[in-house]
Amino acid sequence: MNSIFKSHGKLLITGEYFVLKGAKSLSIPTKFFQTLKIENIKESKLIWVSYDKNNDPWIEATFDLSNLKILSTKNKETLFLKKLLCSAQKINSNFLKTSSGFKVVSTMNFERSWGLGSSSTLINNISKWANIN
């Protein structure tokens, strides 16, 4: 089963650091987004590539699906991705529990440096895939 998830970036009206300290905020969605395309593969691996706006990879990694051990990577962001996947598994213990594997391709149509939510859209897409809120 192949799946596609899409999450729009956001404009945070008040300062992000105030929100992190508990302040209320208003955000509005933008036309910019990140997609997550999941394709089933036969191998029991998770192969992940995330592309930025210029179609350059910013995350490239292969994980052992049984324990999410990083088998190969070229990017330090892979540790953040592993943390997200492990957190999703803690909430939904059936997430990624399969005899087959996955090839995941993430793409965004905005610059990561714009502050529109490259991390938050990735988190939201993984949450949708894991069927968690």
Mark where each language-model region is.
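ATP-binding N-lobe of GHMP and related small-molecule kinases
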Residues: 1-114, 132
